[in-house]
C-alpha cells in the first residue's frame, strides 16, 4: 500500500480521488491464483488503512477447484469484506451471488433498484445458484473444466508449444506463430491475448462446463 502512503503525503491530496477500496480478481484474467498467505497480507493492509477488500469471483469456481490452491470458500469469506460468486462461467444463464462477509450495506436492495439492476423475477437467479450449490454441482463443473484444461496444457507442451504463463485454472495461454494463428482463426474460436513478438501471438483457450474431451483432442490435432 505504498500508493496509499504516498497519496496522503501529498498536501494536495484533497483535490484527488480518494482511494476507497481494493479490488482484486480470483482467479485473475490470466488464470493465476492468490495464495491464502497473499490474501491474508492484502487484507491486513486493507484493515490498517480502513479500506474494504472486494474479490471479483467471476471465475471463482475454477479458483476453488484448482489442484494447487490452498484457498477454500470459508478462507475467502474470512479474508475480504465482500466477494461475488460468478454463475455464467459455470453454466448459469445470468447473474452473480454477492456475498457480504460482515454486514450487508444499509438499503442494499434499494441501491440495486436505483441502479436499474433489480430483476422483476429475481428468483430466476436464485434458483440457478440453489441448483449449483446442491450436491456439489458447482465444484463438479469447475473440476471438469480444469481437468480438460490440464489435458490441453499437457498436449500442447508435448507438441513443443510454449505457454505465456503457467495457469492452474481453466484458462490456458498458448504461444503460436503467425502462420498457425491465421490457420486456427479459420477453424477455432479463441481469444487473441497479446503479441509476444513480431512473429508470435499468445492466444487464450478457456474450457468450461460444456467442453468435452473430444473437443480438446480435436483442438490438439489442429495444433
Where is each model-derived feature located?
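Structural preference for beta-strand elements that scaffold enzyme active sites
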Residues: 21, 52-54, 82, 202-204
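Catalytic PLP-binding core of fold-type I/II PLP enzymes
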Residues: 34-66
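Conserved C-terminal alpha-helix-loop-beta "cap" of PLP-dependent enzymes
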Residues: 150, 155-223
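Active-site-proximal loop/turn and secondary-structure-junction residues that shape catalytic pockets
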Residues: 28, 59-61, 89, 211
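Short, small-residue-biased leader/transition segments that mark boundaries at the very start
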Residues: 1-2
Amino acid at each position: 500500500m505504498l500508493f496509499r502512503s504516498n497519496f496522503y503525503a501529498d498536501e494536495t491530496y484533497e483535490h484527488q480521488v480518494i482511494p476507497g477500496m481494493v479490488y482484486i480478481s480470483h482467479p485473475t484474467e490470466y488464470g493465476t491464483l492468490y495464495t491464502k498467505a497473499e490474501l491474508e497480507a492484502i487484507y491486513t493492509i486493507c484493515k490498517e488503512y480502513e479500506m474494504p477488500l472486494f474479490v471479483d469471483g467471476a471465475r471463482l469456481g475454477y479458483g476453488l477447484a484448482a489442484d494447487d490452491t490452498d484457498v477454500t470458500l470459508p478462507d475467502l469469506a474470512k479474508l475480504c469484506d465482500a466477494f461475488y460468486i460468478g454463475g455464467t462461467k459455470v453454466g448459469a444463464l445470468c447473474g452473480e451471488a454477492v456475498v457480504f462477509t460482515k454486514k450487508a450495506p444499509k438499503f442494499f436492495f434499494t441501491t440495486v433498484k436505483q441502479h436499474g439492476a433489480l430483476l422483476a423475477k429475481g428468483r430466476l437467479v436464485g434458483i440457478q445458484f440453489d441448483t449449483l450449490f446442491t450436491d456439489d454441482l458447482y465444484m463438479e463443473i469447475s473440476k471438469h473444466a480444469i481437468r480438460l484444461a490440464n489435458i490441453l496444457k499437457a498436449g500442447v507442451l508435448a507438441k513443443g508449444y510454449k505457454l505465456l504463463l503457467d495457469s492452474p485454472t481453466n484458462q490456458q495461454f498458448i504461444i503460436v506463430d503467425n502462420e498457425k494463428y491465421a490457420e486456427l482463426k479459420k477453424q477455432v474460436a479463441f481469444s487473441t491475448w497479446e503479441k509476444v513478438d513480431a512473429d508470435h501471438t499468445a492466444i487464450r483457450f478457456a474450457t468450461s462446463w460444456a467442453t468435452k474431451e473430444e473437443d480438446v483432442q480435436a483442438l490438439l490435432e489442429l495444433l
